[in-house]
């Protein structure tokens, strides 16, 4: 008979998804599946669900190797097939998954265009899945209530576990501590004597996921003191309070090289207006080669909800981005130019004008709560 494995909760955790389980510090749990970053456990009330593996520790036995692998070796089991759900009705090839499913017909939300931050790396196991790179951004195009979302990254489209990402469009998630936040602002070291590589300003709020990471609010100025070679998507920074930790580099913009200036002398952002050169020169909504940070500043300084601008993509020279003024947080949507067709999410347009006119009448963004955003007018 296979020995039961007991794990002890190291911290409290509140479930964020239907497939997850609330746990309390020092609670005893039975380990059912440890084959993923998230472990499936059972509590004393016989409820089962997934919890972050770094929130629990083993109490007995099987400390080496995977519990699932040991069970498979013992019982000769193969892969467990996920019960059919709405995801299997996707036009893309259906697959089996080893990730939590509700076991019943799942609801789907289509035609989304929501940016999301990748919290954990994920390697696609099937042809219709999407590999995720920690610290990168993906565009969520479709949601299925079985715990899987469909999105795009670097021109690839596929399914991935929803709790591996954090929606940037979710204002509550942006303003509250992230679901894996441990101790905010935990310092790796005091950073004394470290050479300052850059001075950066944060573009968005961020809550630490691990003890090595550094939490911050939008608009903070920090010093970059190290760029780890083994984790190029993250920079080691020191904030104004002397706390040091890792931050996602695409959450900051470089203001200058070298030591920080006095806070009262933070560089000012010059006026940003429509571009007189570039693909759409002369259009009132085309701002050309401006950064996301400059677009944010312009929208915040002069815009009202619904104002928008279109700019050249920073990551792909031939593509574009739509920046939209919204309550709480501004929204940014990537527009890919493929064979003279403008693609935003799953929709395609023959011209940028057609795209703009479409999203003046149809929502460019719809939240899970029914909030709809439109392109109202070009930023003045």
UniProtKB/Swiss-Prot annotation:
Keyword Endoplasmic reticulum: yes
Keywords from the named record: Acetylation, Cytoplasm, Endoplasmic reticulum, Phosphoprotein, Repeat, SH2 domain, SH3 domain, Translation regulation
Domain SH3: 2-61, 111-170, 195-257
Residue(s) carrying Phosphoserine: 90, 94
Residue list for modification Phosphothreonine: 92
SUPFAM superfamilies per record: SH2 domain (SSF55550), SH3-domain (SSF50044)
Region of interest: Disordered: 78-102
GO molecular function: phosphotyrosine residue binding; protein-containing complex binding; scaffold protein binding
UniProt modified residues of type N-acetylthreonine: 2
Annotated coiled-coil segments of the chain: none
Functional description taken from the UniProt entry: Adapter protein which associates with tyrosine-phosphorylated growth factor receptors or their cellular substrates. Maintains low levels of EIF2S1 phosphorylation by promoting its dephosphorylation by PP1. Plays a role in ELK1-dependent transcriptional activation in response to activated Ras signaling.
Complexes and interactors: Interacts with DOCK1, LIMS1 and TGFB1I1. Part of a complex containing PPP1R15B, PP1 and NCK2. Interacts with FASLG. Interacts with AXL. Interacts with PAK1, PKN2 and SOS1. Interacts (via SH2 domain) with EGFR. Interacts (via SH2 domain) with DDR1. Interacts with IRS1.
Name of this protein: Cytoplasmic protein NCK2
């Amino acid at each position: 008979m296979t020995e039961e494995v007991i794990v002890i909760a190291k911290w409290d955790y509140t479930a964020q998804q239907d497939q997850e389980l609330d746990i309390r510090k020092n609670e005893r749990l039975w380990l059912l599946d440890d084959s993923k970053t998230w472990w499936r456990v059972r509590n004393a009330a016989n409820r089962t669900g997934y919890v972050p593996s770094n929130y629990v520790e083993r109490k007995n036995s099987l400390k080496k190797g995977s519990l699932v692998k040991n069970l498979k070796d013992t019982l000769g089991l193969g892969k467990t097939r996920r019960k059919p759900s709405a995801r299997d009705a996707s036009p893309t090839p259906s697959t089996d998954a080893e990730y939590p499913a509700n076991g019943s017909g799942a609801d789907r939300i289509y035609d989304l265009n929501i940016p999301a931050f990748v919290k954990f790396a994920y390697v696609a196991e099937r042809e219709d899945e999407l590999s995720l790179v920690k610290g990168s951004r993906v565009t969520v195009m479709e949601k299925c209530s079985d715990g899987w979302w469909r999105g795009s990254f670097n021109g690839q489209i596929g399914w991935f576990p929803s709790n591996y990402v954090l929606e940037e469009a979710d204002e509550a998630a942006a303003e509250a501590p992230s679901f894996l936040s441990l101790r905010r602002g935990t310092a790796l070291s005091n950073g004394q004597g470290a050479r300052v590589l850059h001075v950066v300003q944060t573009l968005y709020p961020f809550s630490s996921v691990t003890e090595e990471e550094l939490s911050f609010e939008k608009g903070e100025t920090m010093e970059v003191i190290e760029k780890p070679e083994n984790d190029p998507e993250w920079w080691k920074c020191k904030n104004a309070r002397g706390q040091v930790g890792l931050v996602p580099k695409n959450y900051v913009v470089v203001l200058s090289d070298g030591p920080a200036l006095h806070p009262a002398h933070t560089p000012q952002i010059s006026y940003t207006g429509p571009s007189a050169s570039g693909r759409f020169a002369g259009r009132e909504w085309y701002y050309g080669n401006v950064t996301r940070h400059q677009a944010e500043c312009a929208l915040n300084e002069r815009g009202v909800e619904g104002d928008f601008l279109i700019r050249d993509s920073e990551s792909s020279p031939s593509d574009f981005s739509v920046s939209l003024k919204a309550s709480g947080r501004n929204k940014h949507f990537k527009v890919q130019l493929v064979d003279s067709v403008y693609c935003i999410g799953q929709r395609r347009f023959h011209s940028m004008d057609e795209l703009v006119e479409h999203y003046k009448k149809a929502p460019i963004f719809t939240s899970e709560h029914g909030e709809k955003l439109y392109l109202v007018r070009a930023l003045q």
